[in-house]
């Protein structure tokens, strides 16, 4: 919910470039030659490599909602770890903690 409010505040700035980027981001995760649910796994791995915990949280929520199993999500996190190296380990810890909370039905991510 906090993410939606924050995005609304950003979009309220009424800047064409920002609006276009947000539209591009949304469109990138829609079904295309690759299904949207696979794109969420890609987004998760990329977010881990980029060390963006907010992004990791968002993509974890999307992956859980898309029906990916914990093993499949952890496999995607492994790809992010291999690509990103040891510097992403703190973010991997965060991701595993968040995934556990999501699986228990809680949402401490405030997204």
Located regions from the model:
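Charge-rich, acidic-biased intrinsically disordered regions
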Residues: 67-78, 103-111
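Short cysteine clusters
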Residues: 52-55
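Iron-sulfur (Fe-S) cluster-binding segments and ferredoxin-like electron-carrier domains
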Residues: 58-72, 96
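Immediate flanking context of iron-sulfur cluster ligation sites
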Residues: 33-50, 71-76
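Amphipathic alpha-helical segments within well-ordered protein domains
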Residues: 26, 43, 60-64, 77-78
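Acidic, glycine/proline-rich low-complexity segments that act as flexible tails and inter-domain linkers
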Residues: 1-40, 88-111
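Glycine-rich phosphate/pyrophosphate-binding beta-alpha loops
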Residues: 82-87
């Amino acid at each position: 919910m906090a993410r939606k409010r924050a995005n609304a505040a950003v979009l309220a700035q009424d800047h064409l470039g920002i609006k276009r980027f947000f539209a591009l981001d949304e469109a990138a995760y829609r079904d295309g030659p690759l299904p949207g649910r696979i794109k969420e796994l890609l987004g998760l791995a990329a977010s881990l490599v980029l060390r963006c915990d907010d992004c990791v949280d968002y993509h974890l929520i999307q992956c859980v909602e898309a029906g990916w199993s914990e093993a499949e999500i952890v496999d995607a996190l492994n790809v992010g770890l291999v690509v990103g190296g040891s510097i992403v380990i703190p973010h991997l810890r965060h991701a595993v903690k968040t995934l556990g909370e999501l699986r228990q039905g809680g949402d401490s991510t405030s997204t």
